[in-house]
Amino acid sequence: DSSASYGHQVYLEIIGLVNNRLHDAKRVVTGKMKTMKEDADRLEDRLKDVKTFSAKVVPAGTWCARVCYEDVPDLKECLKLVDSVNGFEAAAKKFLVVTNPMAIGPKEVHRKVEDGMLKELSYSSSSAIHRAMGYIPNLMGTEVTAYPLAGNVYVVTQGELGKSKTTFGIGNGGMYKDTIAALTERECHQALKAVRKIADIMESRNAKNGLFGYSGIYQEAEKIKDKMYKVDRDEISEVKRAYKNVIKLEDAVTTALDRVADGLLAWVKATIKANE
């Protein structure tokens, strides 16, 4: 019947979306992970040659936005993002399990889990909504929440309960002047450790048959194939919305991690140069 045909169509659309992301992520990330770790090792060696860490500031550059949180350079939030990714991934997995067509219940359940997933990473604030409006077009209405991430990335949900749409925007500027604070020796080591961890996270999230990331979404999507023929159109549409949202969230987190890694490497490099 038409519902079964629509279910199959939506299933193919979801699988296609995830497959494209997985393919792109593997192509881009594989080469970049190696470079990330090599750059971190190289800078670690250079740190050994720095006699004193007396510099208080470093010249600002375009890289500064990549270490910003709500437009302000913030090492603490960069490190926090790296440490909170596992919690986000576990919540994302739970979200997809709840979204399984055979387990579809009241829409409130979905929104609660969806919100919980975002809260693993950040919290919504009026200032984040205000800033996100500058980065995401056509963002208006009362049902808007914005979650800032390190890397100056903003995850936004828009729409009423059970019909929300997730998107994200990037701020390529920030509230800093010609200089920003230099890192201490300890902070340099923390930053490089975080970069290596990001490389490992990227690898595990995009590994074949991985539990999390795009690979994890693909695994869950495969499980719903047969069930998509047995639910009505409204439920199928809800599944489609949920998967599109969780893919957007993965896009946002991947973007934030990538930006933070680049920014941290540049920050350490600038600190070393300022102390030479």
Regions found by a protein language model. Name each.
Residues 1-4:
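Non-catalytic, low-structured ubiquitin/UBL-interacting segments
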Residues 6-37:
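Extended amphipathic alpha-helical scaffold segments
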Residues 41-276:
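Long, low-complexity or tandemly repetitive, helically biased scaffold regions used
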